[in-house]
Amino acid sequence: MAMSFITIYTDGSCHTQLKIGAWAAVILIANDKKILTGTVINTTHQRMELTAVIEALSYVQHHLPGVININLVTDSQYVIGLPERRQKLQAASFTTKQGQAIQNVDLVQQLYKLSESFNIDFVKIQAHLKKTSDINYNIEVDKLCRKMVREQASQSVVISAESHLSIVIGQ
């Protein structure tokens, strides 16, 4: 694929009492759109936000060779803050001042490693905005996440703690 620039919209959501989470990503490639989604149990909101970004970047890395420049749009201040905290976290070996591992250390390290393959422009968008042409994809990933969390929460049995990936191609 000759395309070297793409835009990705990500979101994550979690039912805090049940610890059931979902993540979604929309990858825009020229006139094509790829949707990635997944659900996870025993998780947190921040882990879902991170997972959405990681799964999207992993997809790009494995399925879209030649893509280097990524415009990554998220409403997560947590995700947006990670690039600028990288040096400090690495210098502290990903531990807190008390010597404990930082929250989500596994996913943070995975995100940093994946980020090395790309030039990523992390863009913060306000959550839950009214629909306009600029934010339709942010609304789409938000709705996908909330729907999956509701569906998982309504089921009495959640089958696996592993993330389940599904891909929809086209519009």
What are these regions (language model features)?
Residues 1-47, 51, 58-61, 83, ...:
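RNase H-like nuclease fold core
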Residues 13-19, 54-137:
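RNase H catalytic domain
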Residues 124-129, 156-163:
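Short, surface-exposed recognition loops or helix-turn segments adjacent to catalytic cores
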